[in-house]
Structure formats: C-alpha cells, structure tokens
UniProtKB/Swiss-Prot annotation:
The record marks 75 as: Transition state stabilizer. Keywords: Lyase, Magnesium, Metal-binding. NCBIfam families: GarL, PRK10558.1. Mg(2+) binds at residues 153, 179. The gene is garL. It catalyses: 5-dehydro-4-deoxy-D-glucarate = 2-hydroxy-3-oxopropanoate + pyruvate; 2-dehydro-3-deoxy-D-glucarate = 2-hydroxy-3-oxopropanoate + pyruvate. One of its GO terms (biological process) is D-glucarate catabolic process. Its EC number is 4.1.2.20. Binds 1 Mg(2+) ion per subunit. The record marks 89 as: Increases basicity of active site His. InterPro entries: Aldolase/citrate-lyase_domain, GarL, HpcH-HpaI_aldolase, Pyrv/PenolPyrv_kinase-like_dom, Pyrv_kinase-like_dom_sf. This is 5-keto-4-deoxy-D-glucarate aldolase. It comes from Enterobacter sp. (strain 638). Pfam families: HpcH_HpaI. The active site is at residue 50.
C-alpha cells in the first residue's frame, strides 16, 4: 500500500531553516484542532503536558488533521520512553520534549523514538502509525523520519545548551519562555531583560550548532522579535487564547 508518511516534510523544512509558523492546540478537541489545520499553519502542537490530552484524545485530533498542511507535533507530558512509544504507535512523528536540562536527557529522548540498534523503541508489527501493517517500508524509514525538538526552560538547560544542541538526533531547540522566566526568578514576566537575554543566547547557540530554534510567542511583537533574532519555528498563538480573547471581546462589545 502506498503512503504519504515519508519523507517527513516538517523535519525537512526545519533542516532547511525554512520559517515555520505554528499554533498551539490546547482545547483537546478534534473540532478546534481541525479548524487550526484549515487555517494554514505549518505546524500545530497538540499539548500533552498542560492540556487535558491523552492517547484517546490525541487519535481523533490526528484524524482531524489528515490531509491538512499542518504538521502535528506532540508535546509529551514527560521524557519517558513508554509514553513516547505509545505516541509513536498512534501516529506521531514530531515530538516536543519538555524540560530537557542536559545531554543525557536529550540522548534519552532521541533513543526513545528509534528502533534498535539506534534506540530503544519497542516493536509492534501492526499499529496506527504503520497503517496497521500495510506500510512495507515503515521499519526501514521510521528512524530517519522522526523529529525531536527539545525544550529548554531552566537555568540548567541554558547552562548546557551547547551540549544539548550538539546531540545527534536533536532536530531543534525550543524555548519554554514561561518556565524559563520562573527559573530566573521572574515568574509571569518572560519579557524581563534577563529572560530575554537568555532566550537570545539559546537562539545563538542553537544556530552555532546548525540547529533551528523555536518558541511560543502569542504576542505578535514578541513573535516578530524572535523571528528577527533567528528563530525559525514560532508558535504565534493557541486555540484557547484566540477563543478566550474573541469571546471576551464579543461579550464586552454588547455589555459595556
């Protein structure tokens, strides 16, 4: 059976340093995820860390994005091999790994997504990712088509950014601005000069190692500044944020 799984176009675009504009899907709804996919974003994060998602909610969202130009990226709840294996088996190819602080954690994230001998991913011969055994080249192509994006959002992560960025199999470095701000003692203020310097430093070190960098920036001025600083994959909003803002504006227009 033919398939359109390989090659991974999002992974190729990142490697080519093409600008990739994304959005966050936080409502855990296949309807809202489908709407985001229709909007034309290059990539969408389906959030498993802070949104109420699990395996059973992710599958209908993946189905909703079938045929969309938007590449689904799953943010896993934690850097744990069994969780990552299950998300691979349901059909994710692009992974955002939160709270990576050192090279050992980066290596573990990569290994969790690779079949032996390159990694430790468990083997099932029939699952959703290989169209239930109907993709003949799945096992030969899977390892080279997985995207690993690691999130730096702590002081230790910043201190170890060079080693993390140099890790084989890491495709990009993503900044978690809110947790990074908290780690630097500026909870709720990612625009504090100290945090901004750290963000710019991460972008610069990623570039020095030939890796693209990204960030979540729902404020347009922030997003444009980060693009100017060299970030190439930027999430510029979320379904939850857009929905809350638009509904509040609508209510206010009639109640004030």
């Amino acid at each position: 059976m033919s398939n359109d799984i390989f090659p991974n176009k999002f992974k190729a675009a990142l490697a080519a340093k093409e600008i990739q504009i994304g959005c966050w899907s936080a409502l855990a709804s296949p309807i809202s995820t489908e709407v985001l996919g229709l909007a034309g974003f290059d990539w969408l994060v389906l959030d498993g860390e802070h949104a109420p998602n699990d395996i059973t909610t992710f599958i209908p969202q993946l189905m909703a994005l079938k045929g969309s130009r938007s590449a689904p990226v799953v943010r896993v709840p934690t850097n744990e091999p069994v969780i990552i294996k299950r998300l691979l088996d349901i059909g994710f190819y692009n992974f955002l790994i939160p709270f990576v602080e050192n090279v050992e954690e980066a290596v573990q994230a990569v290994a969790s997504t690779r079949y032996p001998p390159e990694g430790i991913r468990g083997v099932s011969v029939s699952h959703r990712a290989n169209m239930f055994g109907t993709v003949p080249d799945y096992f030969s192509q899977s390892n080279k088509n997985i995207t690993i994006l690691v999130q730096i959002e702590s002081q230790h992560g910043v201190d170890n950014v060079d080693a993390i960025a140099a890790t084989d199999g890491v495709d990009g470095i993503f900044v978690g601005p809110s947790d990074l701000a908290a780690a630097f003692g500026h909870l709720g203020n990612a625009n504090h000069p100290e945090v901004q310097r750290a963000i710019q430093h991460i972008f610069e070190r990623a570039k020095a190692h030939g890796k693209p960098s990204g960030i979540l920036a729902p404020v347009e001025a922030d997003a444009r500044r980060y693009l100017e600083w060299g970030a190439t994959f930027v999430a510029v909003g979320s379904d939850l944020g857009v929905f809350r803002s638009a509904t509040q504006k609508l209510a206010d227009s009639f109640k004030k």
